[in-house]
Amino acid sequence: PTTGDAAIYGTAVQNGIQLAIDEINEAGGINGYQIEFKFEDDQSDSEKSVNAYNTLKDWGMQMLVGTTTSTPCTAVVEETHADNMFQLTPSATAVESIQYDNAFRMCFSDPDQGKASADYISENNLAKKIAVIYNSSDTYSSGVYQKFAEQAKTLGLDIVAAEAFTADSKTDFSVQLQKAK
């Protein structure tokens, strides 16, 4: 997305891809072929992402680099799988976003992040009792929290409070913080 709440991620991806393509094309392309790049803004919305995918497919796209965020990526992977289209996401972390053999990710998954966070806290003796505040309306936040809680239990870390909030209440955390005391 280059607009909406996740625009910072989509803009960074778009700029990074463009820099790489410019460098490759200036060096003669790939086996003499220049790379053509077309970008569509999905606004981090699943329906718009599927529509963007179809627009790019109609344009003649041969591989998809995207989408950037998990929920739209999970919707689009159904389409790329049906079309046998190679898909590479730079940053969709939900497990479901690469559930088929045509889709790959360049970063860690939600469970990997949750596990690594609990491991880090345990290995560095940072805490034995932990309070967690997470966005229950967000796939990313919920996915990280689930694996964190599982790994924390395995490691003997005590989650003394696990307080959720939703996207429409993300400006005041006083209730959650009070419960975490």
Show which residues each predicted segment covers:
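Short beta-strand segments enriched in small/hydrophobic residues
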Residues: 1-14, 67-68, 129-135
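Active-site segment of extracytoplasmic enzymes that catalyze sulfate/phosphate-ester chemistry
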Residues: 100
